[in-house]
C-alpha cells in the first residue's frame, strides 16, 4: 500500500524553478514622449488648459521615457470621445477594447516564448495570466487558452487588478507550481493595455496626470519549469526564493478603483520615499541566507514605477549607476507597463549579457534580485540565480 508521503514525494520536482524562455510584444502604435503633451491635450480637447499642459510637459520631460506603445490610436479615441473626457462614463467602451486586445497581445508574447522554448505547446501544463486592464468572465486566461490552442486540461490561474507589483507575484506563483508538480511547464503571461486608465486632464487630479505621463502598453510571456531537459530546454534564470510584504504606514499610497469612468489611478503618499526607506529590509531578509550584503555585487531588476523611485533606491543603497541600466532602458523604451515591466527587463538583461559576452545571463554576476512595487504598498522580492551564457 502506497503512503500519502510517497505520493507527495513522487509529485515534487528535484531542482529549482527555472525560466526557460521569454517573449515580449507591444501594439504597433508608438508615441513619442517629447511630442505627447501636444497630442494628449489636443485629442482630449483640453488645449485651453495652458498651465496644466505646461505642468504635463514638465512631467513628460522628467519621466526619462523616450517612447511608449499604445493600442489607443487617434482614430479609436475619436470614435470613443467619452474615453477622452475626464470622468465621463466610459467603462463599456473601455471593456469592449480590453477584453479582446489583452488576450490578443498576450498571445503574441506567448507565441514568441513558446518558439524560443522549442517544445510543443501540448507540454504546457499550467497557465498563469495577469492583467490590470479590465475584467471578464470567463477570463483572459480562457481566451488565451483558446487563441493558442492549448490543451483543454491546462490548469489555469487568472489574476486581475493586482497592479505594478504583479510581475513578481506571477514568478512567485509559477515557482510554487513548477517545484510542486513534477514535469510541470508553466506559461506565465502579463498583458497590459492603458485603455482602462486613459482620460483627459483635470486640475484637481494631478496624480491621474502622472499616470498619463508614465503608462504604456505591453505583454510579456515566460515559460517556467523545474529540471530542464539537457540539450532540449535552455535555462536562463533560476528562481531561488520569493516573498511578498506590505510596507508599514503605506495604506492608500497607490490606489486604483474600477468605476463607470474606467480605472481611476490615485497616488496619495510619497511612494518613492516609502519604497526606498523599506527596501534594505527586504534585501537583508532575502540575501542573508546566502551571505550577501553588498548590493552592488548582485544584478538588479526593479519595477520602474517612475524615475523618482529608481533614483531614490539608487541613492539609499549606494548603487552604482550601471546596476539599474536594464531597468532604466526598459522605462525609456516602453514606459511603465505595470506587471509586464520586470519580465521585459529580464529579457533585456539576458540579451545584453549575451551580446556583451558577460559570462552569465545576469550581467556576468551569479546572484540577482527582482523587485515588484505596487498598490498596498506591496513589495514582491524574488532572488534569482543566473546561468552561464
From Swiss-Prot:
Q: Catalysed reaction(s)?
A: (E)-4-coumaroyl-CoA + 3 malonyl-CoA + 3 H(+) = 2',4,4',6'-tetrahydroxychalcone + 3 CO2 + 4 CoA
> What Enzyme Commission number(s) apply to this enzyme?
2.3.1.74
Top EC class, one word: transferase
Q: GO biological process annotations for this chain's record?
A: flavonoid biosynthetic process; polyketide biosynthetic process
The UniProt keywords, alphabetically, are:
Acyltransferase, Flavonoid biosynthesis, Transferase
The pathway is: Secondary metabolite biosynthesis; flavonoid biosynthesis
User: What Pfam families does its record include?
Assistant: Chal_sti_synt_C, Chal_sti_synt_N
- Name the CDD domains for this protein: CHS_like
Q: Which residues form the active site?
A: 164
Question: Could you tell me the superkingdom of the organism this chain comes from?
Answer: Eukaryota
Q: GO MF terms on file?
A: naringenin-chalcone synthase activity
Matching InterPro entries: Chalcone/stilbene_synt_C, Chalcone/stilbene_synt_N, Chalcone/stilbene_synthase_AS, Polyketide_synthase_type-III, Thiolase-like
* UniProt entry tagged with the keyword Acetylation: no
Question: Which PANTHER family is this protein grouped with?
Answer: CHALCONE SYNTHASE 1, HYDROXYMETHYLGLUTARYL-COA SYNTHASE
Instruction: Report the family membership.
Output: Belongs to the thiolase-like superfamily. Chalcone/stilbene synthases family.
Q: What is this protein for, i.e. what is its function?
A: The primary product of this enzyme is 4,2',4',6'-tetrahydroxychalcone (also termed naringenin-chalcone or chalcone) which can under specific conditions spontaneously isomerize into naringenin.
Record protein name field: Chalcone synthase J
Species name? Petunia hybrida (Petunia)
Gene name linked to the record: CHSJ
Amino acid at each position: 500500500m502506497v503512503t500519502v508521503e510517497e505520493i507527495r514525494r513522487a509529485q515534487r520536482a528535484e531542482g529549482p524553478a527555472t525560466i526557460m524562455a521569454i517573449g515580449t510584444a507591444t501594439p504597433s502604435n508608438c508615441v513619442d514622449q517629447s511630442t505627447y503633451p501636444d497630442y494628449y491635450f489636443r485629442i482630449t480637447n483640453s488645449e485651453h488648459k495652458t498651465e496644466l499642459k505646461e505642468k504635463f510637459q514638465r512631467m513628460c520631460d522628467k519621466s526619462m521615457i523616450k517612447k511608449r506603445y499604445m493600442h489607443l490610436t487617434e482614430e479609436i479615441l475619436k470614435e470613443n470621445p467619452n474615453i477622452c473626457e475626464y470622468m465621463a462614463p466610459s467603462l463599456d467602451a473601455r471593456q469592449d477594447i480590453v477584453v479582446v486586445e489583452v488576450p490578443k497581445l498576450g498571445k503574441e508574447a506567448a507565441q514568441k516564448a513558446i518558439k524560443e522554448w522549442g517544445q510543443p505547446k501540448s507540454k504546457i501544463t499550467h497557465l498563469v495570466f495577469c492583467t490590470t486592464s479590465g475584467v471578464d468572465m470567463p477570463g483572459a486566461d480562457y481566451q488565451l487558452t483558446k487563441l493558442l490552442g492549448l490543451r483543454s486540461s491546462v490548469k489555469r490561474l487568472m489574476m486581475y487588478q493586482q497592479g505594478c507589483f504583479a510581475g513578481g507575484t506571477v514568478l512567485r506563483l509559477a515557482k510554487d507550481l513548477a517545484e510542486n508538480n513534477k514535469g510541470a511547464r508553466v506559461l506565465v503571461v502579463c498583458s497590459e493595455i492603458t485603455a482602462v486608465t486613459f482620460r483627459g486632464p483635470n486640475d484637481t487630479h494631478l496624480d491621474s496626470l502622472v499616470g498619463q505621463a508614465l503608462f504604456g502598453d505591453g505583454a510579456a510571456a515566460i515559460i517556467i519549469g523545474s529540471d530542464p531537459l539537457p540539450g532540449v530546454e535552455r535555462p536562463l534564470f533560476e528562481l531561488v526564493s520569493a516573498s511578498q510584504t506590505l510596507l508599514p504606514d503605506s495604506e492608500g499610497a497607490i490606489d486604483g478603483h474600477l468605476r463607470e469612468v474606467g480605472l481611476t489611478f490615485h497616488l496619495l503618499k510619497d511612494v518613492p520615499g516609502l519604497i526606498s526607506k523599506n527596501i534594505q529590509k527586504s534585501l537583508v531578509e532575502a540575501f542573508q541566507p546566502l551571505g550577501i550584503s553588498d548590493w552592488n555585487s548582485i544584478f538588479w531588476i526593479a519595477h520602474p514605477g517612475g524615475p523618482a523611485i529608481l533614483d531614490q533606491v539608487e541613492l539609499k543603497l549606494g548603487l552604482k549607476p550601471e546596476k539599474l541600466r536594464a531597468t532604466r532602458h526598459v522605462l525609456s523604451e516602453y514606459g511603465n507597463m505595470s506587471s509586464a515591466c520586470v519580465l521585459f527587463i529580464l529579457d533585456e538583461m539576458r540579451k545584453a549579457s549575451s551580446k556583451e559576452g558577460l559570462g552569465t545571463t545576469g550581467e556576468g554576476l551569479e546572484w540577482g534580485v527582482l523587485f515588484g512595487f505596487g498598490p498596498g504598498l506591496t513589495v514582491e522580492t524574488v532572488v534569482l540565480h543566473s546561468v552561464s551564457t
